[in-house]
C-alpha cells in the first residue's frame, strides 16, 4: 500500500496480485487462474500473428478485456470509496536534515576515509564522496578527505573475513558500503570480526527486477501483467515460447544472471529461485534451502541460465552489442538486474569491464523493468564503519560523519540523482521516465537473514548449472618471459589456473589444452588433459598443467578454431560449454600457414547459432592481441578479460571462472 507521502513500506506478506487487494482464495487456485490467463494470452498472440484476418477482432477483444480488467481493478481497489488508512507499522516519512559542514576546514594532514563500494553502486558512492569533499569538514580538528574505492561485493566479503591480507593497513577501507546487507551477513558468517553488530545505515535503495527488451516483454504480455518467479523460470525452460508467440527468430528464452557469489542481483535471483521452489519468497528458511526437493527444483531452474557473469554491466554490454548488430534478443531475453542498471542501459551507458563507462546513443530496444507478482528483493546499500584494528578513532569518527552526510537533504538528492530511490522510496522524475520504473511498486521484500544467506551461498555450487570447460593456454616462446624474480608468465599462469580449478566441483567437466607451433608447422602439444569430470580427474589435470613447457610460435587462430569445434561436438543444453583462452601474443605461424582471422570468426559465429561454445578470452601481458581476443569473445557471446598487467592474472582469472 502506498502511504500519503508516497513511501512504500517493505512488504513481508505473501504474493500479491497485479491489481488491488486479492479475493480470498487459496494460493493454488490463484496460481491456476494466472496460468490459464497466461495460456489464453499466448493463444491470442499466436492467433494474431498467424491469422491476419482476425487481427482487428483480436485487438478489439484485447481492448475490451483490458477495459474490463481495469474496471475490475478500480472496483477492487475501492476507487469510489474513502481512502484506506495507512498501515499502522509503516514508518513516517523522513524529513531529511540539512548538511552541517564545518565553518572552516580542519588542519592538515587530513584524515583519509576509504569507502569501499560495490561495482553496482560505485557511481553513487563516488558522487556522495564528491559532495562531502566539496564542503569544509573538521573531525577532531583535522580536515577530512573521502576516497571511494570499489570491489565486487562477494570478493570484498571474503577479503574482509580474512582481514584484507592483500592490502596494507593504510589501504584497507574505513567504511564498507556494499549494495545489500546480505554481504555483511556473509562476511560475518565467514568469520569477519570487523563488521559491527549494530544495524547498518541504509543510504538508498534499488529494487532487483527482471529486465527485458521492450518487444520481448510485450510479446508475452509481461509488460502488462507481471509474471510470478515460477512463471519466469518456466518460461526460461520453454524451448518454443518465442516461436509460439510468433517470433521464432528470437530463438530460445535466454535468461541472464550474475553470479550469486559476487553480485547482489545474482544473490536475489537465487533467493527467488529457492523461494519459488519452497512456495513463497518471504518464507524462505535455511531448512527449506537444505530440502532435497527444493534444491532439485532450483537445479532445474538453473538449467535455463545461459551463463553467469560477475556484474550486471557485463550482460548489458553484450546486449547492446547484439542490438547494434541486429537485436538484443540475439543475446538475451531477460536479465535479473537492479533498477539503476536499467536506467544506465536505457540512457546509453554501458561498461565492458564494470569500471570504464562509455556513453553512446540510447538503444532502440529499451529495457522494461518487470516487478514479479510474488515479490522482488530490494538492495538497501548499507553503510558501516568497520571495527578493524586498522581503523583509528579519528577515521571512525570521520567515516561516521560521511554516513551522516549521506542521509542529509543534500546527500539524498545525490542518491536520487544517481538513479537510486531515497530513504523515502522516492525517485528522480527523469530516472523514472528513462528507466520506465514503477514509482511505487507493490511487493518489495527485504533480503533474508544471515542463516539463509549463508545456506544459499553454500548451496550454490551444488545447484548451479554444470560447466564443460576447456582451458586453452598459449605456450609459445614468449611465455618464458619473467614477470618477477621468481616467476615467468608460464609459471604464473600455471599457478593461476590451479587456483581457479578450486571453483569447479564434482559434476563439472574440465580439460586442458595448450598450443605452440613446432618447427615442422604442427600445433603442439594440443590436448593434455581430456575434458572430464573434475571430481575424478583433478590430480591428472594438475599433473598435465605442471608439465606444460613453452615451445615455438603462436598458432592462435588455429587453436581457437580447433578446440571450439571440439567442444561443440559434445555441446549440451544442460551445461555451460566454454573455452577459456589465455594468450600473451599475436597469431604468428611462420612454419606453416593456418586458418586466418576472418574464417576463424565466421566459424565461431556459425557454432554460436547451433551449438554455442562460449570462448572467454584473457589478454595476458602487454603484447597480447587485445583487439583479436575481444573479437573472439564477442563472436561467441562470451566476455573478454584484461590481464595485460600479468601480476593481476590470479585475480582476473578468479573473476572469470565465476561465469560458471
What are these language model-derived features?
Residues 5, 73-251, 262:
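N-terminal segment of the mature folded domain
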Residues 225-238, 254-261, 273, 382-420, ...:
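Bilobed periplasmic-binding protein/Venus flytrap-like ligand-binding cleft at the lobe interface
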Residues 273-369:
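Ligand-binding pocket segment of bilobal, Venus flytrap-like solute-binding proteins
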Residues 465-582, 614-627, 649-653, ...:
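Von Willebrand factor
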Residues 197-210, 295-305, 356-390:
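Periplasmic-binding protein-like
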Residues 355-364, 585-644, 648-656:
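VWA/integrin I-like adhesion module and closely mimicked acidic/polar interface patches used
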Residues 2-54, 59-94, 105, 109-111, ...:
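Extracellular/periplasmic juxtamembrane helices and adjacent flexible linkers that interface
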Amino acid at each position: 500500500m502506498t502511504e500519503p507521502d508516497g513511501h512504500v513500506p517493505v512488504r513481508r506478506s505473501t504474493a500479491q496480485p497485479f491489481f488491488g487487494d486479492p479475493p480470498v482464495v487459496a494460493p493454488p487456485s490463484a496460481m491456476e487462474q494466472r496460468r490459464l490467463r497466461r495460456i489464453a494470452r499466448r493463444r491470442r498472440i499466436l492467433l494474431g500473428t498467424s491469422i491476419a484476418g482476425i487481427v482487428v477482432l483480436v485487438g478489439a477483444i484485447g481492448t475490451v478485456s483490458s477495459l474490463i480488467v481495469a474496471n475490475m481493478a478500480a472496483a477492487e481497489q475501492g476507487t469510489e470509496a474513502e481512502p484506506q488508512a495507512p498501515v499502522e507499522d509503516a514508518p513516517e516519512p523522513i524529513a531529511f536534515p540539512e548538511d552541517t559542514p564545518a565553518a572552516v576546514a580542519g588542519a592538515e594532514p587530513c584524515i583519509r576515509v576509504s569507502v569501499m563500494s560495490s561495482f553496482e553502486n560505485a557511481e553513487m558512492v563516488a558522487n556522495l564522496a564528491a559532495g562531502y569533499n566539496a564542503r569544509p569538514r573538521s573531525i577532531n580538528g583535522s580536515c577530512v578527505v573521502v576516497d571511494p574505492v570499489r570491489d565486487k561485493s562477494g570478493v570484498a566479503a571474503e577479503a574482509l573475513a580474512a582481514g584484507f591480507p592483500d592490502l596494507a593497513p593504510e589501504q584497507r577501507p574505513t567504511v564498507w558500503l556494499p549494495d545489500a546487507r546480505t554481504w555483511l551477513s556473509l562476511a560475518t558468517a565467514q568469520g569477519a570480526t570487523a563488521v559491527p553488530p549494530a544495524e547498518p545505515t541504509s543510504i538508498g535503495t534499488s529494487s532487483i527486477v527482471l529486465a527485458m527488451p521492450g518487444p520481448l516483454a510485450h510479446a508475452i504480455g509481461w509488460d502488462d501483467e507481471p509474471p510470478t518467479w515460477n512463471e519466469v523460470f518456466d518460461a526460461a525452460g520453454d524451448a518454443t515460447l518465442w516461436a509460439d508467440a510468433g517470433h521464432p527468430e528470437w530463438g530460445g528464452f535466454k535468461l541472464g544472471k550474475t553470479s550469486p557469489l559476487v553480485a547482489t542481483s545474482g544473490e536475489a535471483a537465487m533467493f527467488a529461485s529457492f523461494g519459488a521452489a519452497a512456495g513463497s519468497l518471504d518464507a524462505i528458511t535455511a531448512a527449506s534451502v537444505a530440502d532435497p526437493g527444493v534444491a532439485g527444483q532450483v537445479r532445474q531452474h538453473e538449467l535455463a541460465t545461459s551463463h553467469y557473469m560477475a556484474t550486471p554491466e557485463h550482460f548489458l554490454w553484450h546486449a547492446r552489442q547484439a542490438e547494434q548488430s541486429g537485436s538484443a534478443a540475439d543475446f538475451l531475453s531477460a536479465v535479473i538486474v537492479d533498477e539503476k542498471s536499467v536506467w544506465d542501459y536505457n540512457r546509453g551507458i554501458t561498461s565492458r569491464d564494470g569500471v570504464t563507462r562509455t556513453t553512446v546513443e540510447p538503444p532502440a530496444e529499451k529495457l522494461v523493468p518487470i516487478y514479479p507478482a510474488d515479490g522482488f528483493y530490494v538492495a538497501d546499500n548499507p553503510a558501516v564503519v568497520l571495527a578493524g584494528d586498522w581503523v583509528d578513532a579519528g577515521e571512525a569518527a570521520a567515516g561516521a560523519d560521511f554516513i551522516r552526510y549521506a542521509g542529509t537533504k543534500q546527500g539524498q538528492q545525490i542518491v536520487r540523482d544517481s538513479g537510486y530511490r531515497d530513504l523515502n522510496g522516492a525517485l528522480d522524475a527523469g530516472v523514472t521516465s528513462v528507466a520506465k520504473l514503477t514509482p511505487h511498486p507493490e511487493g518489495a521484500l527485504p533480503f533474508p537473514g544471515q542463516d539463509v544467506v549463508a545456506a544459499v551461498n553454500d548451496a550454490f555450487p551444488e545447484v548451479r548449472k554444470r560447466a564443460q570447460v576447456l582451458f586453452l593456454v598459449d605456450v609459445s616462446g614468449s611465455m618464458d618471459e619473467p614477470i618477477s624474480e621468481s616467476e615467468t608468465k608460464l609459471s604464473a599462469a600455471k599457478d593461476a589456473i590451479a587456483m581457479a580449478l578450486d571453483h569447479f566441483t564434482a559434476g563439472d567437466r574440465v580439460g586442458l589444452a595448450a598450443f605452440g607451433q613446432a618447427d615442422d608447422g604442427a600445433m603442439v602439444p594440443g590436448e593434455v588433459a581430456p575434458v572430464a569430470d573434475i571430481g575424478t580427474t583433478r590430480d591428472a589435470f594438475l599433473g598435465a598443467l605442471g608439465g606444460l613447457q613453452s615451445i615455438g610460435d603462436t598458432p592462435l587462430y588455429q587453436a581457437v578454431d580447433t578446440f571450439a569445434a571440439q567442444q561443440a561436438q559434445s555441446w549440451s543444453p544442460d551445461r555451460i560449454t566454454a573455452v577459456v583462452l589465455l594468450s600473451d601474443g599475436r597469431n604468428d605461424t611462420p612454419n606453416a600457414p593456418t586458418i586466418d582471422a576472418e574464417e576463424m570468426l565466421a566459424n565461431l559465429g556459425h557454432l554460436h547459432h547451433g551449438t554455442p561454445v562460449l570462448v572467454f578470452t584473457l589478454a595476458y601481458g602487454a603484447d597480447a592481441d587485445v583487439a583479436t581476443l575481444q573479437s573472439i569473445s564477442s563472436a561467441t557471446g562470451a566476455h573478454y578479460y584484461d590481464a595485460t598487467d600479468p601480476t593481476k592474472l590470479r585475480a582476473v582469472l578468479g573473476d572469470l571462472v565465476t561465469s560458471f
